């Protein structure tokens, strides 16, 4: 193996630049030529390849976003699009790929490998922490810290005005951000996709948890698949308990921004190195992850098809500290 190419795809996550940096530096350490593919699969199709040396990735470990940009590619979904991408891979003489992203990224990489046998090792880059094969994903810790900073500020105004705040965080299919943010922010409840929402449970908890000395509450809501989910839930509660002053805050894309935390920088650096060394060991069609502090490699098909369960220890911690389960 002489040449590798690195790309980011799908939703951005803090720490992607740290992972790019690590992959590039690891490649040069092992005497490889390293290219970056700008704008993910679209860039692969259009031949948007740039050579990356160590200087090109200096001073990026602390930056959010991705210097290689990211884009969702409809064309790559088609056999014709993937053929164009393969032609560009051959043109530049690329022997192996490093893919940084989530489920969509690895679905594309799986298809591409099955058709053209270009070795690819992935690194999990998504704030949702929803990928099977790694305890944590790049960007998750930073996103939780971003949420926590907002929760702490909202708690101040919620207490001052004795309000109930529903704070919506990202997480379409999983409640990892919601649960960890709720625990670290001392929230009274978290509503997550793993468990069916029951408005009567929320109503009863608020009814029995509100008193003359405790009238403010913070409820964290994972966005799920329904747009404006926190607003919908807030309306349910307001109709049932009109005496409560209910407010909604949607944190949105602020969770994806900002410089990565120390934990994400270290995680991304470990995974960037692991992708390159995985390629050199002859691995292909796998994602590098960290489980129990050790590097592991999981087939893309498993990361795509297997569901990563919510951490039961986190749920147990929340229940014991809060006196109630998050299973609402």
From Swiss-Prot:
Q: Where does Mg(2+) bind?
A: 103
Catalytic residues, per the record, are 128 (proton acceptor)
Write down the chemical reaction(s) this protein catalyses. Answer: beta-D-fructose 6-phosphate + ATP = beta-D-fructose 1,6-bisphosphate + ADP + H(+)
Q: Which UniProt keywords apply?
A: Allosteric enzyme, ATP-binding, Cytoplasm, Glycolysis, Kinase, Magnesium, Metal-binding, Nucleotide-binding, Transferase
Reply yes or no: does the keyword Magnesium apply. Answer: yes
- Name by which UniProt lists this protein: ATP-dependent 6-phosphofructokinase
EC top class, as a word: transferase
**Known EC number:** 2.7.1.11
Q: What is its main location?
A: cytoplasm
**Which gene name belongs to this protein?**
pfkA
Residue positions binding ADP? 21-25, 155, 186-188, 214-216
Q: Which Pfam families match?
A: PFK
Check the record and name the InterPro entries matching this protein: ATP_PFK, ATP_PFK_prok-type, PFKA_ATP_prok, Phosphofructokinase_CS, Phosphofructokinase_dom, PKF_sf
Family the entry assigns: Belongs to the phosphofructokinase type A (PFKA) family. ATP-dependent PFK group I subfamily. Prokaryotic clade 'B1' sub-subfamily.
